[in-house]
């Protein structure tokens, strides 16, 4: 059996494991105050062309989202997100557990628009009973989205502009950011994220690291005392250098971008194979996540050799499923899967 159900079925890229072993017996300061975290921070700042950014390393995505959102919002504020957004459907109420409501907006493809946000905020701030309701205080988006779709630079800029209009923060979840940045249709760069968000993070857990997410803060107000929030939310790793070593390695010789491109290229081969067979696609994704609509009988046949994720029923006889490639996916296995798709 070969697993395509997610992009974190393996451990870490061999270069990271090698560097972890090489540095294992070194003595360093803890809590992210070591030379490896310093080096990784500087590399990220250079790539973002933003020397004033603050960079912090946390362990996982949900922990990162709860820490950022709880640091950014007042007690009476909530986070605006797509109804399918990770914080709304896949984090077990973690945001709500901090006392902040998720304010969902409808979305067919995983994205939300500046127009939607503007309409929601206008309705709130012109309501005579506004102080009786949760105030929108932040917009949360992800790139790629849960559905593998991508924001354009124009869409990002428009969202940032409407956030400034209503004095809100824009937070971009980058758990799969590498796969978004390297997608053939993507026009957003790290430099754009530094300009047109208040805070974003660069995912490591799903892009070659054993664990870890790198939070990049450009908003001055959010920078203050952020390490206190990390500690309070259980995110300050005593052996913080384990995060620094990993991100320092990922951003040496463009490794992060190379392994992300590898996953996207293999995903595009799968996408073309599904289309050639005549299968529809639930979402038009150019990232490492693909969502073909298959006859249920074909799904059962493919499940004999591969593990992939059920997404939703489309008809009585068809379902959408998700296939994920990753930095570790073997090209020869993708070729074998393509042959099996053709044989269905």
What are these regions (language model features)?
Residues 71-89, 118:
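Conserved PLP-anchoring active-site segment centered on the Schiff-base-forming lysine
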Residues 74-78, 268-342:
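Conserved C-terminal alpha-helix-loop-beta "cap" of PLP-dependent enzymes
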Residues 102-103, 170-172, 281:
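Hydrophobic beta-strand scaffold residues
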Residues 108, 135-137, 142, 150, ...:
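Active-site C-terminal subdomain of aminotransferase-like
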Residues 151-183:
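Catalytic PLP-binding core of fold-type I/II PLP enzymes
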């Amino acid at each position: 059996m070969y697993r395509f159900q997610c992009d974190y079925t393996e451990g870490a890229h061999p270069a990271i494991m090698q560097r972890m072993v090489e540095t294992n017996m070194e003595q360093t300061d803890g809590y992210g105050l070591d030379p490896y975290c310093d080096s990784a921070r500087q590399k990220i700042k250079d790539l973002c062309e933003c020397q004033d950014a603050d960079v912090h390393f946390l362990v996982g995505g949900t922990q990162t989202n709860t820490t950022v959102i709880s640091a950014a919002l007042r007690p009476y504020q909530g986070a605006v997100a797509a109804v399918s957004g990770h914080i709304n459907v896949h984090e077990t109420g973690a945001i709500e557990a901090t006392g902040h409501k998720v304010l969902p907006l409808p979305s067919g493809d995983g994205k939300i628009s500046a127009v939607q946000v503007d309409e929601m905020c206008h309705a709130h701030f012109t309501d005579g009973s506004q102080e009786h309701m949760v105030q929108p205080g932040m917009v949360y988006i992800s790139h790629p989205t849960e559905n593998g779709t991508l924001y354009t630079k124009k869409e990002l800029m428009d969202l940032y502009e409407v956030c400034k209009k209503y004095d809100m923060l824009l937070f971009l979840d980058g758990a799969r950011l590498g796969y978004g940045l390297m997608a053939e249709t993507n026009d957003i760069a790290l430099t754009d994220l530094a300009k047109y968000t208040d805070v974003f993070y660069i995912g490591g857990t799903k892009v070659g690291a054993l664990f870890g997410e790198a939070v990049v803060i450009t908003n001055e107000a959010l920078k203050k005392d952020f390490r206190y929030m990390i500690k309070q939310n259980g995110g300050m790793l005593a052996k913080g250098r384990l995060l620094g070593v990993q991100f320092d390695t990922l951003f040496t010789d463009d490794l992060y971008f190379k392994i992300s491109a590898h996953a996207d290229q293999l995903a595009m081969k799968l996408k073309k194979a599904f289309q050639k067979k005549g299968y529809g696609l639930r979402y038009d994704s150019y990232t490492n996540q693909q969502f073909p609509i298959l006859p249920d009988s074909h799904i059962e046949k493919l499940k004999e050799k591969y593990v992939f994720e059920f997404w939703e029923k489309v008809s009585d006889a068809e379902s959408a499923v998700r296939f994920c490639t990753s930095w570790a996916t073997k090209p020869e296995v993708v070729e074998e899967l393509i042959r099996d798709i053709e044989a269905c």
